[in-house]
Amino acid sequence: DDCVCPGGREWASVASKADSQEARVNRLAGRVEALAENLRAGGDRLSHYKSEFRELEFRVDELEGNGCEPRHFQCGGSAMECISDLLTCDGSPDCANGADEDSDVCHIPPIAGTLLVGHLNTDHDFCTKRKPNEFDLFISSVQRSSYFQSRLKVKGNLQIKYTAEGRDQEDVLQVKGYYNFGTHQLVILPPEDDRLGIVCNFRAGNDDRCRAHIVHEASLEHCGDDFVFVKEDDHH
């Protein structure tokens, strides 16, 4: 009875979801190809097309993967090539097409002075002690080591807003972490003894927001729902 067999109700549901996913990938792939043609043609809107092209490529990779193992960078181009993310933006091209040293890959989204604001759903938070409803992450320092250029050392302050005993509360924690050029990830290391950190995934071509989640340090298992950090332009 538990078999998902052709012709059965469960099979129809699975097949429908698979068809829907394939259709989404095909639509995105079509848009990527159209933008690639615009990039080849050049024109006044080249930078706009390039940014949108990278955004769409990222979305396709999210749906079907990019063919690389975890902690690897997809070089792109006509031939499949993957390199360790430790080799990205280290000052020496390792991809055959030099993509790992491209300025779009190696630019820095979380510059010093950046404020990222995220709103969290407390209903599914079963592991934090405060059950925060808002994170305000202020990046105070970004440093790049000459001997380890593929990572940026990041320091900042995390303002945690939550409700306790019927009142709005705020705590501020000093935090540190790193930015990984190869994966476009900002990682905030656990600031407290609960060993919960934050991982935030930027999309190539979009520095204004990143998809974030609280994670257990040991397992990287997500704690509660994902949320979105949005860059605040004016936080004076």
UniProtKB/Swiss-Prot annotation:
Disulfide bonds: 68-82, 75-95, 89-106
Entry GO MF terms: oxygen carrier activity
This protein's UniProt keywords: Disulfide bond, Oxygen transport, Transport
Keyword set includes Membrane: no
Annotated function: Acts as a linker for the assembly of heme-containing chains in the construction of giant hemoglobin.
Subunit structure: Disulfide-linked dimer of identical chains. A model is proposed for the subunit structure of the Tylorrhynchus hemoglobin, consisting of 216 polypeptides chains, 192 heme-containing chains, and 24 linker chains.
Name of the protein: Giant extracellular hemoglobin linker 2 chain
Annotated source species: Tylorrhynchus heterochetus
